Amino acid sequence: MAQDEFEKLPEEGQKKKKKKSGCLIALIVALVIVLALLITAALGLNYVFGKLGRFENPVQGGETISMLPEEAETDPAENVEGLESVDASDVVFETVDVLEGDVVNIMLIGQDRRPGEERARSDSMILVSLNKERGTIQLTSFMRDLYVQIPGYLDTRLNAAYRYGGTDLMNETFKVNFGLEIDGNVMVDFDEFTEIIEIVGGVTLDISSAEASYMNKRSDNHFKAGSNYFNAEDALTFTRMRYAAGGDYGRTDRQRRVIMAIAYSLRNADLVTIFNLIDQVLPHIVTNLTDAQIIEYATTGLGILANGGEIGTFRIPQDDAHYNANIRGMAVLVPDLEMCREDLKEFIYD
């Protein structure tokens, strides 16, 4: 071998070492970047979770009672005129099996706090069901005047369960009556929806002529039957509409429609919009979901929306699955629970 060839060998070895050294540096830099991103993500999640409120259970000492104060059941404005009087003992509830399926059920609770009350009734109860297999998000409103069995208490209105025993009793009530396993609860004040709607830039809703007439009496903007743009203030008025355009049934339907409109608006939301939502809205939300559950369910829900998944709406009870009655001075809806459970199974699970 020539002398000049011998002289080249160390130089080639040095190049290999330099190449290996360069790869190692690149790997270290990549690891540092990944670590920095993970730390940033963790700090961001801690910031997000720190904004949320948390439920406290149990309430009122957790005592089991068989009688409720009269004022706890009846409303001063109760109107039972024309309703059939039914003895409470004539309404019989049976034990039911829990509905099963790969579905996440989250109960969205809207509050109705009255003066002097420590805990409000659940004014609105909307079940958000994430079905990954079907790629759908289903919203089910439960009428607050449903007459149901509440474990440890007299049978009474569904919306009393949260006031008497918080989310624990509320979830148990849904389980024994409707066979629903609730995975978590999120409580919001529908008044706070104005902030959400302002951040997403308003919503577009299809409304009826009766709804348009109601809105025109209460808004500076003009509404017509069909598609209309709603700013935050008008959307709040729309969700509160009760004594017109369908009464309480119409009100729960309007709440679902506004939630759907917000969800569709979030499909294409940018990072600035999402950050504003986190910063301004989360402080008004209370939940018993763990941090891990929030990440999992939010990822599932956003994934369904991003893939063009459908959002369906439903109401319990359906028109043919209940009758109106006067029980102990309360105007209530007595449900056919078997029909209700069949409807829920078909809408959410099948």
Where are these regions (language model features)?
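Non-catalytic, solvent-exposed segments at the cell envelope interface
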Residues: 2-29, 37-350
